[in-house]
Amino acid sequence: GRNSSHWAVAFLATLTYGAVVVPIQHEFTTDQVYNIVNHSESKLLFVGDVVATSIDSKEMPNIEGIVYLPDFSVMESRTEALTYAREHLNEMFGHKYPKYFRKEHVKYHVDSPEELAMINYTSGTTGFSKGVMLPYRALWGNLDLMMDVIGKHIKPGSNVLGILPMAHMYGLLVEFIFEFCYGNHIFFLTRLPSPTVVAEAFAEVKPAIVISVPMIIEKIIRKSIFPTAQTPKVKLLMKMPGIGKKVKEKICQHVMDVMGGNAYEVMVGGAGLNKEVEDFLLEIGFPITMGYGTTETAPMITFSDYKDFVAGSCGTAVKHMEVKVLSDDPQNIPGEIVCRGINVMHGYYKNQAATDAVIDKDGWFHTGDLATMNEDGHFFIRGRIKNMLLGSNGQNVYPEEIEDKLNSMSMVSESLIVQRGDKLVALVHPDQDEVDAMGFDKEDLQNIMEQNRQDLNAMLPHFSKLSEIRIQDYEFEKTAKKSIKRYLYQNAE
């Protein structure tokens, strides 16, 4: 189900009971839900209002019961114990705690850090979902990190807006578990995070820190800030000695106000921030920073406070973790990011072969991401190994870098670079609001995209130039962290 206080209660109740949590992302299809429930051998399924009307319990033969999250009613029970417990819940609670539930009844077991806490099934961009086994030590390692890097900058009791899905590790750990343990007041966003909806929520909640994925921040900046801040007049004023500083400060405060006016920093993760947006925010002195991680590390691998942030990077190695780049010259030649430490998973549930493929004999987890690292230890992601393409002369092409440039061009909302034979083609979903506002027809749009292609190719080495831009009428399908599901489009025409 979607984020809610009841989802949070079910999560915490499961952990404190001593059972294993299996979060299911609300974007998953019913078939994916059945596969996860059956593969994980789950005994109890909590469902939100949307999922409740679409699932068929017969497809999950080993489940013992289904609980409706909005009111915790039992939709289906297959055991007498569950039926009795729900019907006599108050009576059983009163019998166990005759003088009410008090502080001394709370007991935390801290002697089993290797015990399994969660199995989190990846959404992935390959279409194959694996169950990531995360022990309690991995949750603690990330919590301890967040207490250290964020806790010292915000006050307990301050407000935080929960935008990201809690079924995803980034949203769960960084936007819920940390804030809950630190004593923040969490407001769950229950609607789709459009720029308007998010801006309204920011204005009401005034969060002490903003935690987001790039797409949300990029849309807010492009829709709410760029129309006034990127005019020729303002750009000229920003470059003028003396007055330029004041103009930048005013724009920075405007951006801060759009995000509630109270945030220590804006922490972005899940993918790289568009370079145009990042450069703009850094130019005006806005407190933006990036982190990097994976489901398999629950999730953090690198992070830096905005005061230590380097443009284009995703931070330095976090505490409790060793991180390195497998390259003979990591400052200049990209290599795979590998890491080890207490954040790393046990492995993939019921999939030893997949586990052995990513965790080597020395305990290093191979992320599948390519990066360089500067002399100060800041990491710069180049792309995924599996996404890397070969250019016309056999050179490596990193599609994410081309997409980042293309996404800043006229009428482009999002893009995907694919290979067709020995040629590179861009699939582009246009910014339809902007197209409609300008009154452009299909022919106009094609002409604009052709100009974009020529302008982009002028910036690219010859082996990574685009042969064509094809217009995609609908938004690309995405994972929970808003990464495009590339596998769906590799062979699409």
Where are these regions (language model features)?
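Short hydrophobic alpha-helices that are characteristic scaffold elements of the AMP-binding
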Residues: 11-17, 39, 177-181, 221, ...
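Conserved C-terminal "lid"/linker of ANL adenylate-forming enzymes
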Residues: 389, 414-425, 452-493
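Conserved AMP-binding/adenylation subdomain of ANL enzymes
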Residues: 140-159, 167-253, 262, 287
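Structural core segment of the AMP-binding/adenylate-forming
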Residues: 16-93, 422
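Conserved pre-ATP/AMP-binding loop-to-beta segment of ANL
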Residues: 86-121, 128, 153-159
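Adenylate-forming
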Residues: 344, 378-407, 434-444, 460-466, ...
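Conserved ATP-binding/catalytic segment of the ANL
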Residues: 317, 324, 331-332, 336-391
